[in-house]
Amino acid sequence: MNDITDPSLTTPRAMSGRGNRLSADDWAQAALDLIAEQGVGAVAVEPLARRLGVTKGSFYWHFPSRDALLQAALERWEIFEQKEVFGSLEDVPDPSARLRALFQLVAHEVKPHVIYSELLKALDHPAVRPVIDRVSQRRLDYLIASFRQAGLSRTDAQHRARLAYAAYVGFLQLSLQLQQPKQAREDFEAYVEHVIQTLIPG
């Protein structure tokens, strides 16, 4: 993934056109930004309040606890994927073209994947594991269905979906956790095209 950041997952500006009032969504998005930067363990009320330029009272207006905020942040991330990723592909009728569009979309949206990588490090957290399980299963189911529609048998579609997902998670590990050198843009684009040509039928 390169350095293109999706505008739907950017930090809210405190006191932007609403005085000093922030919504619950603003707090949830700020928590996601902090997860992307420092991990789940960094989510806390005081640093988020400082980041947003408000008092802790604004937080407690919307959430009873830090755990409630974390749950809202995870739900926001999950809903974003359902609507902005899978939802954006509903109008692509050809299954192979839909898979190609999915691979390109996933390759060029950075922040959701950084968040996912950080969540994988926190699977022992009781709020994180159920979300990761749902998201991972939904992704695999979508891939299996798409590969089936593209002409593969059920068994081959399952194998291809797992291979595609393993390539995705493995790339995250190499890029974000093992901190391999960042690829030049042309090299990255060539890699994405190679993955597409290797995994997508026809």
Question: Where do the language-model regions lie?
Answer:
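Alpha-helical DNA-contacting segments of helix-turn-helix folds
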Residues: 63, 70-77, 84, 131-132
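Hydrophobic/aromatic-rich alpha-helical bundle segments in the mid-to-C-terminal region
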Residues: 129, 133, 148-202
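N-terminal intrinsically disordered/low-complexity leader segments
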Residues: 1-22, 152, 202
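Helix-turn-helix
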Residues: 26, 30-72
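Amphipathic alpha-helical segments used for helix-helix packing
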Residues: 109-133, 177
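Hydrophobic alpha-helical connector segments
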Residues: 72, 83-116, 164
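Solvent-exposed, amphipathic alpha-helical segments
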Residues: 26, 30-38, 84-88, 118, ...
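Short, solvent-exposed amphipathic helices
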Residues: 131-138, 142
